[in-house]
Structure formats: structure tokens, C-alpha cells
Amino acid sequence: MKASRFFIGTLKEAPADAEIVSHKLMVRAGMIRRVAGGIYNYLPVGLRSIRKVEAIVREEMNRAGAIELLMPAVQPAELWQESGRWEQYGPELLRFKDRKDNDFVIGPTHEEVVTDIARNQIKSYRQMPVNFYQIQTKFRDEIRPRFGVMRGREFIMKDAYSFDKDAAGLNESYRKMYDAYVRIFSRLGLEFRAVAADSGSIGGNFSHEFHVIADTGEDAIAYCPTSEFAANVEAAEALPLIAERAAPAEAMEKVATPGKAKCEAVAELLSIPLERTIKSIVLATDNEGAEPTIWLVMLRGDHDLNEIKVSKLPGLKNHRFATEQEIVEWFGTPPGYLGPVGTKKPVKVIADRTVANMSDFVVGANEVDYHIAGVNWGRDLPEPDVADVRNVKKGDPSPDGKGVIDICRGIEVGHVFQLGTKYSEAMGATFLDESGKPQPMLMGCYGVGITRILGAAIEQNFDDRGIIWPESIAPFEVVLCPMGYDRSDLVRETADKLYAELVAAGIDVILDDRGERPGVMFADWELIGVPHRLVIGERGLKEGKIEYQGRRDAEATLLPADTAAATVAEKIRAALAH
């Protein structure tokens, strides 16, 4: 590719609405331009990287035995009504009517459409396993699109859907996709972690997320540096931090805590560790035609509630936070001084695992400006229902018993689910088994955010000059920067020869023949993030040398002109192999 025949739309300044590095650099590097909120044009530089991501994803999906198809972006409402998601999905689902007043949606996912394909095309167990995938544009009407391609409304995604006759088959399909994702993100040259996760609105039983590690990531990941354990903080099991409850050592005592409504303030006033205080959180579940059930969830003062874990407990699937009016009615006091001792009306108490093993702890007295110290289970309170209801935190024991938890930030770029029969039962996707009896198909679903990967890769790979692409997804692998291409025959002939050698070696190279000043050339290609640069100058050529600099290198080095192309080609092959 010659730069004079390519579109390079670099900018010196980022737009005012760009908040994070990837958004700023994608605009400045001429990769994207905003059309509307969360909707972008992908300019030639950006599209080249997208196509490279797609190629790797496609190769690994095919290698894993998945079969490519293409489903429509526009889907009839009837399919979503069959699955139940027409009512369940919120305003993120873009709905519209055609000229005949029929309801349609712009697909954010394709579970319904692919299940419709399966129920019409798969009739026998002999036709399974099968795994369909597509790479397609989707739309989710985010309430507040931001961060460029990281949380856009329109995005490109690879989604795959497996169909199996039994659980063993589903497990095998899931394993193949999991392994394929590990290969994909390894080939993309990204630091990533596969983490156990909650299935969210997609539904299903078993789930892993793939996160690119980045300080700007929206998700907190709990992992163990000395083992294989990794999980989304929402899904990570929080082990009890006290192995065995100690015998009571204090008498229960009401203490004045004027104006101290927070655990930290109470601990400071009483000169006790924060770990001896209890955080009381009041939840409610509604009962048709009757007053709500009120739940008191007890956490250690330094711990945070995990609502996803709570929602999986019996009776709490549709919980909400209690209103202040309900809190006063059941406890006799506003929030800040709540506790399980002496409530006005009966409440259901759930203690986190760590709280259940505590003794001599401090709780609210259900009276403004007072707490109760020296509280103990069995003596002062009945034994509680016990559950894991908190987020893990740094320093907790790892659930696999092989070390302690650390926390990092990640950007979700892939997700694999075992859906089971959630959609096949709802939509009647059955097959005849070996005995001729109809059975629901077991499904898995597997997504990769193609355009999101670009943003995540940049968040992990940049400096103050611009993007630093991994070789596998860089818009170009090498840029040739000739000094005086239009003035020096020697420079032009050498640059053209290098270009031909690199093309022949299968290297994705661009020759900057625009006639720009060196500073402009260097700034453009450093901003765009091309991993390798060769500078061809007349002075160096007279000594048989060409200047080479990798995008991550602090200094340039000189290479023999006659072997420069081969040297750079080998560097690229080594990077891709690694």
C-alpha cells in the first residue's frame, strides 16, 4: 500500500466528548468518526484492524468446528415473544413497526433466530452436535453510550450457538469454544484472563467471561496470582474469614454513638477495629395483596453486598431495597442505626459467612445515636440463616485454597454460556433421540465483541505518542519512511525495493510517499501505532544502513540495507508466533 493512495485522517486534538484513551486515540488516529451517539463510521485505518480481528476469530471458529452463516439484523417480534424476552428485555431492545404495523426488533443478540433455525432444520440426534456462528453488526440502545466503541449502540460481534443432544455433548461444545477463545485472545497479542461469571440476562447455568486486563476496565476481577483461579467479583465465592466462632468474652451493652451512622465512624468512636462492626442492609420482597417480607442482611463493616449472590437465594430473586418508610415501620429508626436486636416487627435475618462466625460484634440498636456492643449468636440472637452474600476483596483466601485473592480491572471482550434448554423449551426446539422420543436441544452461546476488542487493545497498549498495536491486529505491520522520496533516486529506488521485498515476504507494509516532513510522518505513524518503522535516508544509504525502530523501542538502531527487509520480516514472524 502506498500512503499517497490511502486515506490517513489523523488529528492533533481529540474531540471534547472523548473520555478515555482508546476513544481519544481512535478518533485522532483516523480510525473512527462519530455519526450519532454510540454510532460510528469506521474509516480505512480502523477497518483494516477490524478485518484482522475478524480473520483471527473466523480461523479459530472454523478450526473448532463451528459453521458460519448469516442471520438478519431485523427480527420479528413473534420470536422474542415466544422466548419471553419481548417482555423481559428493557428499552435497550430497539423495537419498531413496519408499514403493515408488524412489530420488529433490531437484534442485540440472535438466540431466538438461531433457535428458530434449529427447530426447523434439526430433526434427529444424528444431526448434532452443530455449532453455527456469524460475524454481524448488532444494535443495543444504550441509555448513555460513551467511551467510543467500548459502549456504543451499534457494534460488530461474533456470536456462535451450539446445539447438542445431551449434557456431555454440551460440555464438549463449551470446552471447544473456551479453548478457541483462549487461542483467539492469545493470537490477538493481548493480556487477558478467563473468569467465572454470572450469566446475566442471557440466562443459563455455566458461564465464563474473557477480560482484557486494563486499569480503565469497568469490571473488577478477582484472581489468585499463585493459581489458575479467576472470577468476576460478582461471581467469586467469598470464603469465611473466621474459621471458628470464639466464645463470648463481653456482655451485651447499649452504647451511645451520637451522630455516628457509618461503621467507620462507630469503630473510631469505640476504638475498635472496623472488622468488629456489622453493616445492616434491609431488603424487601413484595407479596401480592399483603405487606412485604423484610430481610436484614448482615455484613462485616468492611465488606460490600453482592446483589447477584443475594438474588440467587431462596425467596430473594426479585428483591429490592426497602424504602425508608418500611425501615422505620419494621425497625423503629431510620437507616444508620439498624440491627437485628429488638426489631419492631419480625424480619428474616441472613448473615454472611464471616458474620456468622463472629463474636462480640457491634450492631445498630434500632435507636438513633445508639449501638449495641458485645453481641453474640446463640446468647443474644438466634442462630441466623447463613449465605455468601458479599464481594470478595483483596487479601481474601482464594476459593481454590492455593493462595490469596488480588483484584484487577478488566474489559469484557468475550463471553461463553451454557444455556441448557432455556430457549429450546420455550420455543419448541426438539429432536428425536435414539429411542424416537422428542427431547429439547441443549444450547450454548458464545460471543466476541469484535469492535470492542479494538478499544480494549488500545487501553492496554498506548503511550503519550499514540497507539502501540500488537502485530496481529495493527492496520499495517511496517511503515517505510523515505527521506526525500520525490527528490532522491537512491532513496526512492531503495524504498521501492524494500517495499517489494516485504510484500513478497507476506508482510503488511505501507510506504509513505506523501512527501511530508519527517516529523509529520513519524507523528502520524506513531499515533496510528504501526509496530515497525524503517527510515530510508540518503546519508545512511551511503554507509549501507537503514534506520529501524520498533514502536516500543526507546531508541532507533541501524540495520544493513541489504538485509533490513528480512530482519524486520523475521521480527514480525517471531512476534506473531509468540
From Swiss-Prot:
Keywords for the protein's UniProt record, in alphabetical order: Aminoacyl-tRNA synthetase, ATP-binding, Cytoplasm, Ligase, Nucleotide-binding, Protein biosynthesis
Subcellular location: Cytoplasm
Molecular function, one GO term: aminoacyl-tRNA deacylase activity
Role according to the record: Catalyzes the attachment of proline to tRNA(Pro) in a two-step reaction: proline is first activated by ATP to form Pro-AMP and then transferred to the acceptor end of tRNA(Pro). As ProRS can inadvertently accommodate and process non-cognate amino acids such as alanine and cysteine, to avoid such errors it has two additional distinct editing activities against alanine. One activity is designated as 'pretransfer' editing and involves the tRNA(Pro)-independent hydrolysis of activated Ala-AMP.
PROSITE patterns: AA_TRNA_LIGASE_II
Swiss-Prot/TrEMBL catalytic activity: tRNA(Pro) + L-proline + ATP = L-prolyl-tRNA(Pro) + AMP + diphosphate
Top-level enzyme category: ligase
Protein's UniProt keywords contain Nucleotide-binding: yes
Domain notes per entry: Consists of three domains: the N-terminal catalytic domain, the editing domain and the C-terminal anticodon-binding domain.
Main location as per UniProt: cytoplasm
Swiss-Prot/TrEMBL GO biological process terms: prolyl-tRNA aminoacylation
Pfam families: HGTP_anticodon, tRNA-synt_2b, tRNA_edit
Species annotation: Burkholderia cenocepacia (strain ATCC BAA-245 / DSM 16553 / LMG 16656 / NCTC 13227 / J2315 / CF5610)
Superkingdom assignment: Bacteria
Subunit structure: Homodimer.
GO CC annotation terms, alphabetical: cytosol
Protein name, as recorded: Proline--tRNA ligase
EC nos: 6.1.1.15
Gene name of the record: proS
Family in the record: Belongs to the class-II aminoacyl-tRNA synthetase family. ProS type 1 subfamily.
Alphabetized CDD domains for the sequence: ProRS-INS, ProRS_anticodon_short, ProRS_core_prok
Keyword Ribonucleoprotein: no
Family annotation (InterPro entries): aa-tRNA-synt_IIb, aa-tRNA-synth_II, aa-tRNA-synth_II/BPL/LPL, Anticodon-bd, Anticodon-bd_dom_sf, Pro-tRNA-ligase_IIa, Pro-tRNA-synth_IIa_bac-type, Pro-tRNA-Synthase_IIa_type1
